[in-house]
Every structure is written in C-alpha cells, then in structure tokens.
A protein has these predicted regions:
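Hydrophobic alpha-helical transmembrane segments
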Residues: 1-174, 178, 186-317
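Glycine-rich phosphate/dinucleotide-binding loop and adjoining beta-alpha-beta core of small-molecule
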Residues: 183
C-alpha cells in the first residue's frame, strides 16, 4: 500500500500542488510550534538552560505527536476500508511534497524578471526565501530563486519522498514537522540561539543522508537535462561544505556546477549582514532562464528519486 500511496501522492502534487483553500498540515504544525513555544517560554526560566530545555521539549513533542496522530488516523482509515486507508495516505503524501508549489512560485519570479519589473520580482522572491529582498538587484533576485529551488529540491521534495517510501505518510509528515521547526526556530540570533538549537540539530540529522542523495541525483540529472554533469560533480565535491548547515550546500553546489554559475555569498537577514561564502564558479552571468533550468532539474531529480526508491523498495519486499 505504501508504494501506491507514494506514487499517487507524487501525481497529486504534480497535478494540483497545494490549493490555497485547503488547510495544509505544515500550517497546523506552525501553529502548534508557536503555541508550544509561547507556553514553554512562559513557564521556564529565560536562562540559556531554560531555553535549551524548552527547545528540546518542542523538538521532541512535535515530531512524536505528528507521527502518533497521523499513524492512528491512517490505521483507523485502513480498518474502515483498505481503499480509505490508501486514499488518506495518498492525500498526505501529496501534501508532504512541494514540487509544484516550488515551481509555481519560482516561475512567478521568472515572469516578473522577464517583464523587467524588479519591485514585483523582489516581492515574488520574498515569498520563497528568508533573506531581505528589498534591495536585491535583478541578478540577486535570480540567484535567490535558483538557490531556493536547489535547496528545497532536497528538503521539499526528495527527502520527503525518501521518508514516505520508508514509512508512508506518517514518517513523511514527521519529517515535515522537523523541517518546519527548523525553519521557524533554527535561527542563530538572540531569540533562538538556545531555544532553536535542538530543532536545528534534529533537522541536520534528518537531512544528512537525504541531502547527499539529492546532490548525487542532481549530478545525474544534469547529464539528462543538457547541463554540465562534470561541473556539477566537481563543484559539489569542492563546495558542498560552504554553508553553516552541513546539508544546505549539498544540492546548491551541484546546481551551481551544473549551470556554471555562482550562488550564495553575502546576504542580509532581518537587517543583519551575513558574510557567507560563495558556491560555484561564475563561468557566465546568472540569468532568469536559470530559474527554469533549475526547475527542470528539480523535476527530473525527483522523478529519479521516486523510480529508484520504488525499485529498491520492490526489490526488498
């Protein structure tokens, strides 16, 4: 049943994405994180030790709660009817994937750049990146969009695919809970330096293997999409550690090498300057069409992940 649910969920995401009218599990997770953080901060001392404890409790409760609730719902649905159980798993597998949404948002950035509407392009890219965008040049907007497609190809598409192939929708949504915690709490600023540490470390562990598999898939994908596979391999080997996170530069470096452009570098977050290292070599200037090229590689890489994962699961069954 798991394999059918994964394939069905993949198709659902490719066809429909995440409709705006439908409440997404990640939104519910975000609300739970905010309320749990508020509850714990009000009851624990505001010392580093108190914040570390609060963050650890959050990092334990949300993933465990997500797995238990979704597992119980899937089991109850399957007990009522195998078809209902499959439908629930398929629906949640589709919601755990973000390929179509990522492609739509990044293509909107591309559309504004092509129209030379820089303010609109900045606004569009601000929906999918965490950095400050109000002063970005057209090149900076393009770079930000390509980077987010490359990074989210791993944690928004390939990693959830791998987890759902192992444990169905419950494990995929548990991964999304971990990923959501990191995106909300995993900042190294005054507010979250201690409270967000457990969430950030847990996300590093959850993404360690998937991010590296995603990078290798991206290298393979470059050969099938008219990009530079040798360059992708070379830059991945050289620059995959050029990030504070052990995972974020994995697919970014493979993407930069495949396209022959330079990504990353210094950026502003919440008004604060971060002197981050660059990734890749600027063999040519980055251009809006690179957003479309990155999307194409993201789709092909996710297709490879599904096909190879399904084949391995079928072989082991």
């Amino acid at each position: 049943m798991i394999l059918q649910a994964v394939v069905g969920g993949f198709v659902l995401d490719a066809l429909f994405g995440d409709p705006a009218w439908l409440l997404h599990p990640v939104v519910l997770m975000g609300r739970c994180i905010s309320r749990l953080e508020k509850f714990l901060r009000a009851r624990l001392p505001g010392t580093p030790q108190g914040e570390l404890l609060g963050g650890a409790v959050t990092a334990f409760c949300l993933p465990v709660g997500t797995f238990l609730v979704t597992s119980l719902v899937c089991l109850a649905a399957a007990k009522l009817s195998p078809w209902l159980g499959l439908a629930v798993q398929m629906f949640w597998c589709g919601q755990a994937l973000a390929a179509r949404g990522l492609a739509q948002e990044s293509r909107n950035v591309y559309a504004q750049l092509i129209k030379n509407d820089l303010p609109a392009a900045r606004k569009a890219v601000s929906r999918i990146v965490g950095r400050d965008t109000q002063d970005l040049t057209a090149e900076g907007v393009t770079k930000a969009a390509v980077e987010t497609v490359a990074e989210n190809a791993s944690d928004g598409v390939i990693a959830p695919l791998l987890y759902m192939l192992i444990g169905g929708a419950p494990l995929a949504l548990t991964y999304k809970a971990i990923n959501t915690m990191d995106s909300m709490l995993g900042y190294k600023n005054e507010k979250y330096l201690y409270f967000g540490r457990a969430a950030a470390k847990l996300d590093d562990v959850a993404n360690y293997i998937p991010s590296r598999l995603a990078a290798l898939l991206w290298v393979a994908t470059a050969a099938f999409t008219g990009n530079d596979a040798k360059g992708a391999w070379r830059i991945w080997r050289r620059d995959r550690r050029n990030h504070a996170s052990p995972n974020s530069a994995q697919t970014e470096s493979a993407c930069a090498g495949a396209l022959g452009v330079q990504l990353a570098g210094p950026a502003y977050y919440f008004g604060e300057y971060y002197p981050k290292p660059t990734i890749g070599d600027a063999l040519r200037p980055i251009e809006p069409q690179d957003i479309l090229r990155a999307n194409r590689m993201m789709y092909v890489a996710s297709g490879f992940a599904l096909a190879w994962g399904a084949a391995i699961r079928g072989f082991l069954a």
